[in-house]
Amino acid sequence: MSTATSAPVVESMSDTVVCPQLSRHSTSLEELYTIGYNRSHSPSCFSSAGCEEEEGQKNVLAERYKTKLCKNFVQYGTCPYDIRCMFAHGEEELRTAEMNIMDGLVTKDAITSFQKLWHRAVSASSGSKHHSSHVANRRGVMTTATTTTTAGGSTDAAMHICRRMQRVVAAAAAAVPCGGRRVVSGSIRIRGCVRHNPYCHNILPTVSRYYSTMPDVFTRPYSKSDSCGNEAITEGNAWTYANEEGNEKETPAMISSGVPELTAWKRFNYVAERSQCTSVPEQNLPCADFAAIKESNNTGGNASGVDVENVDDAEHSTCSSVGNESGYFCRASRSASCGEQSQSHLKREGNEGRGEGLHMFLSL
């Protein structure tokens, strides 16, 4: 048997790989090849030139396979060669030349068989199949690895691959949940996954999703009458005001699915605005009662015998709603056609020299 001479190692393609720093042993590749691979079988060729060429090719494959990171995978996250790529797709796939020689990954057929086993192990641990399929895949890996032999007739190299793939499959199957189920060490088995969606539209209203906690003030609509006699009718979640003419005006919903849409301050302002009288005459016009009083005076005096005071002031006054600072003093009296007696006279001092104002409520 002739002594094997060292062949020049072909440098890896620098434009397609990224070279990480890997730990190297002091033992040469030729010595590792001799004790790890050639020990199990005799060389297939007996000529010095043939063995030299074969050993050189094996050293090149051992130096190249998965010893460097794939540049396409690092830059773009994908590689067109997928599992057939000679370079590592991630740090977990990085290998050293010594590991390739010890596992027999020095020929094209051995590397192809290893790639098939690796792909089957990854597919088995993907979690898309049931636990029984993982067991079947593991058995298939063991059977295939046992019956597979390399081009040089090495059975030990296939056994190295078999034992290595068994550890990979066992670790992957324990880490990845199967069929939506997960087994945690020291705990019970979690059956299935949570299917409840807390943000489903028919469980929580849209407004409630923006509250970290429920508001302190929780109000519900109720029937009441404002100062103008319009009754607020509650129908469902909306407030409806029915005025004297029978027209109904629906306001925005005060409460939406159990959560108040408006705050307490906005609701107070809203009720205050709606409480103003909408059926009174326009501004700068005399009230209906004063118009009736003026008519009775022009037709023959006060038929009811009630004194009408400050009629001139009354003509210039306005029938305003609560909160209107007109600055005029207005006093109401019973008209000749009305059989009702005036109820109350309210006086209010005006600020900043505006004079006295009157808030007058008329009973119909």
Curated annotation (Swiss-Prot):
The recorded induction information for this protein reads: Induced during the response to misfolded or unfolded cytoplasmic proteins; including during thermal stress, sodium arsenite, or acidic pH (at protein level). Not induced by endoplasmic reticulum stress.
Q: Which Pfam families does the entry mention? A: zf-CCCH
> Knockout consequence?
RNAi-mediated knockdown in the bloodstream form is lethal and causes a reduction in chaperone mRNA levels in response to heat-induced stress. RNAi-mediated knockdown in the procyclic form causes sensitivity to cytoplasmic protein folding stress (induced by high temperature, puromycin, arsenite, MG132 or ethanol), characterized by a reduction in chaperone mRNA levels.
* SUPFAM superfamilies assigned: CCCH zinc finger
Q: How is it modified after translation?
A: Phosphorylated at the N-terminus. CK1.2-dependent phosphorylation may lead to proteasome-dependent degradation of ZC3H11 in absence of stress.
UniProt-listed SMART domains: ZnF_C3H1
Q: Which InterPro entries match?
A: Znf_CCCH, Znf_CCCH_sf
Region feature Disordered, mapped onto this chain: 340-364
Q: How does it assemble?
A: Interacts (via MKT1-binding motif) with MKT1. Interacts with PBP1 (via C-terminus); the interaction is direct.
What does this chain do?
RNA-binding protein involved in regulation of mRNA stability. Binds AU-rich regions in the 3'-UTR of mRNAs and promotes their stabilization by recruiting a MKT1-containing complex. Stabilizes chaperone mRNAs during stress that causes an accumulation of misfolded or unfolded proteins in the cytoplasm.
Put simply, this protein is called RNA-binding protein ZC3H11
- In the UniProt record, the gene name given for this protein reads ZC3H11
